[in-house]
Structures are given as structure tokens and as C-alpha cells.
């Protein structure tokens, strides 16, 4: 079934109308070549969870991170289909504090709550793990600020 669909796509991609409206066909590779070209896209390197966490902690721990890089990192992290580990969030909150960007700290915590979705036990766990950092940096949660009622 997949081979037939790939062959149809390959033929459609190599057929064009000439100047008189006649259909012309370029020589198409066989079905094995078409399937092989699709499979080549999945041969990228795979990052382990530990490498992923280390990459993001390192990113947010850069001493010269600026506000644009911070927001870009937060936006990229939020697009992933996961709730970041508390150590990544800790590093991001510390970067926000270095830049005196309180709004981003609230945004990060709101994003974590949103990413947890229907799993109501995830957000309290993350806040529990981050509580020492939140207290140290003087950061209030959205609930403490009353933003959850707005």
C-alpha cells in the first residue's frame, strides 16, 4: 500500500504539461528508490533524556544570556510535547532572576501548569521541587499572585 502511494507521488511529481498541453514524463526512479528517500529522513541522532536535560540546563545557565535568548529558549521549550524537568525550570528561573525579568518567571510557571494538562499531580510536584528556589529568588507562583482566578 505504501509502495503504491509512493509510486503515485513519484509519477505525479515528474509529470508536467508541455507547451502544447501534452503530458510529458521524466524518467522516475523505481519504487525502492522512492521508499529509500523517505526512510532517509529518520536517521537523525536521538538525544537521551539526560542529554536533553543537560542541554537545556546549560543553555539557561549561560552567564551572558540576554533577554531575547531567554525568551527564545522558553518559547522553544514550551513547544515540545513534554513538561520540563524541575532542574530545567530551576535554571530558567535563575536566568530570569539574573535578568530581573519577573514576568518571564510567571510565564514559565504558567506554561508548566498548562503543559501538565489534565494530569493534576504534575504541577504541584514541580512547585514542590522548585519551592527552595522560589523562596531563595523571591518568586511568587501565579496562584500566590491570584492570577489563577483571573
From Swiss-Prot:
CDD domains: Cyt_c_Oxidase_Va. Residues 1-41 form a transit peptide. Pfam families: COX5A (PF02284). SUPFAM superfamilies: Cytochrome c oxidase subunit E. It is found in: Mitochondrion inner membrane. Keywords: Acetylation, Heme, Iron, Membrane, Metal-binding, Mitochondrion, Mitochondrion inner membrane, Phosphoprotein, Transit peptide, Ubl conjugation. A motif (SIFI-degron) lies at residues 2-20. GO terms for biological process: mitochondrial electron transport, cytochrome c to oxygen. Component of the cytochrome c oxidase (complex IV, CIV), a multisubunit enzyme composed of 14 subunits. The complex is composed of a catalytic core of 3 subunits MT-CO1, MT-CO2 and MT-CO3, encoded in the mitochondrial DNA, and 11 supernumerary subunits COX4I, COX5A, COX5B, COX6A, COX6B, COX6C, COX7A, COX7B, COX7C, COX8 and NDUFA4, which are encoded in the nuclear genome. This is Cytochrome c oxidase subunit 5A, mitochondrial. It comes from Macaca mulatta (Rhesus macaque).
